[in-house]
């Protein structure tokens, strides 16, 4: 019992159902915001104050985006684990996607619809992110090559970014809209 109690309770939640433990956390991670501090300085932004809200994210993104499309303010991947990114956006919009019992979904709730619209608008309306598909597998390289100043990605990338970034970078919590939030990823044994 002491061994099970040594895990973070929040990470144990998705391995439990009906009061029983069916799985234990393995290779867990969360989505974080990696940002290029040098790019922030060049854009006149404080490199020690990453965007804390959706509004600040859009405003910083506008300053960080090159008009010729050679550099984007931000990128959120839409392949690989798009449900994970969508889950982060809905959490930030104070919207759960499923009932606690797991028998009802809320994809059509206004908080979910608005979160999806915000994600789409980052490219189509605000022009701070490319429209269309953003590949999970190549996003990290885009960040390391300076093609985006901000990327949302897994904590699992920290070592690679740390070992390969040729610029000063920071890692921050994802911004909030109605609240802060990021779902855990990874798997269970």
Could you describe each region identified by the protein language model?
Residues 44-50, 102-104, 120-133, 147, ...:
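A local structural motif
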Residues 1-32, 58, 85, 170-172:
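Hinge/lid segment of periplasmic solute-binding proteins
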Residues 18, 70, 92, 161-177:
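Ligand-binding "clamshell"
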Residues 57, 64, 87, 141-146, ...:
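Hydrophobic residues within well-ordered alpha-helices
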Residues 1-7, 50, 73, 95-116, ...:
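Short, solvent-exposed loop/beta-turn-alpha elements that line the ligand-binding surface or hinge
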Residues 136, 153-158, 175, 187:
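Beta->alpha turn/N-cap motifs
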Residues 58-63, 102-132, 174:
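Glycine-centered hinge/linker elements that transmit conformational signals in sensory
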